[in-house]
Amino acid sequence: MTKKNDVTRIATGVRNLDGLLHGGLPRGSVVVLAGPPGAGKTILTQQICFHTASVRQRVLYFNTLSEPTAKTLRHLTQFSFFDPRKLDVGGVQFVDLGVILRTKGLEQASKLIMDQVRKIKPAIVVMDSFRVFDDLARSKEELRKFGYELAVNLMAWEVTTFLLGEYGPLDISTNPLFSVIDGLFLVTQREQSGEQQRFIQLVKLRGTEHSRDEHSFVITSKGIEVFAPRVTVQREDRGPGAARCKTGISKLDELLGEGIPRGSSLLIAGVAGTGKTVLLLEFLYRGAQAGEKGIIFSFEETKERLLATARGLGWDLEHEIQRGMVEIVFIAQPNIMVEQHLLMMQERVHAMQARRAAIDSVSVFLHKVKDPQIDREKVFQLASIIQNSQAVGFFATDIPYGTHQLSRFGVEETVVDGVVLLTSTEEGLGRQRYIEVYKLRNTAHLKGRHSMLVRSGGISIFPRYDMDAELDEPPPPLEPARRHPSGGSGSR
């Protein structure tokens, strides 16, 4: 248990959930977990119980008519958090209320519950499902009396109580139970961004500051894992600092002036075939040769294809991987889960202590996002990962064909610190590539388009020295982004 502001809290043991609760659940709270069948209420509660349970902190788990205890235990064995030793020593004790509810009613069930509490003196009590009591109560008055007396008695014993039920929005506004409880967690499941996702929302929790946003979560063999980038990926209050990064790419550093400020993120924007992936790979390869670790998150090309590209350009990228200077993380497009992989990227950058990070590409990573506001928020979170680690990030993005945008929605470039624009035009019987440093905050850089070639050895740039250097100042505070036509992103 932990203390915060003189309130004793119980750690849940669920990844990132304690962060949403600012340290854990206040001891003695009566909390309702509401949601439809299959949303994850029971697994979430059981994971908290087995994390907390010990000989000194016992758990009383009351099963009602919804599911017999034997079936509950059979399902529990699938999860790594399940520890049968805690059953053997009485740390977790299951009690079946089904028979007494069917034969004796609410009053006798309440008496049995409190008799068990006095006998066991638990730290946690669970009732799964509490909705059964609603169905058995003869009136709202009886239900209110039962719920109030039970809550008061359990609070007197400083017992943290979880009441699970298939409650919906109408129940929350009309059921008398919700007027006496301390906390309400909504657990739901629905389709979002083209995939079925589970969400948890902390609607109410007395005596504690907490996030009120919806946060996605998954159920795995380890149990429940909550993804909350709005809480866990927050930008630290720090400026770019004086340190600068030289890319090591031929002539690009001349365009960039004194270098890229540490903590900066650059959008590498262009249509298909303009050299975005090659630029990202060379950025990491040259960094590794200069002693800077780098990582690339690829959502399009597999590790093998990226290595083949590097070999074709004459780079021994495999050697840099073997000596721990470069890491390639491939996630296939159908497997992308934005919030989960945001946290994964944060952890991998931190664990590697990467000085350079590349994403290929943000347009594919966020391809299921249809709302420009959400797209902007996620790019901001990616940029925050880079700034907090004081690395330098190169984010490839596809420009929609036939538009003058610099990104998919036309809002991402307002979030990042710099934009490098890659283009190509027909000249004679071929195409000529160009590179332009469109913006780079706090850095005097060379303006205009400059010729670029991709050939053996990497990228070659031919600067036009008749262009003037320009300093990009930090912009004023951003206003809420307006919706732009999305257009389609070009495929590679």
Predicted regions and their residues:
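Flexible beta-alpha connector loops of hexameric P-loop NTPases
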Residues: 4-7, 63, 95-107, 133-144, ...
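Short glycine-/polar-rich loops that comprise or flank the Walker A/P-loop
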Residues: 28, 55-58, 89-92, 157-159, ...
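P-loop NTPase motor core
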Residues: 31, 106-180, 184, 278, ...
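Conserved P-loop
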Residues: 36-101, 262-265, 271-335, 489-492
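Pre-Walker A adenine-sensing motif
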Residues: 12-24, 248-259, 487-488
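Conserved beta-strand position immediately N-terminal to the Walker
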Residues: 30-31, 265-266
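Conserved P-loop NTPase
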Residues: 1-7, 118-120, 189-250, 347-353, ...
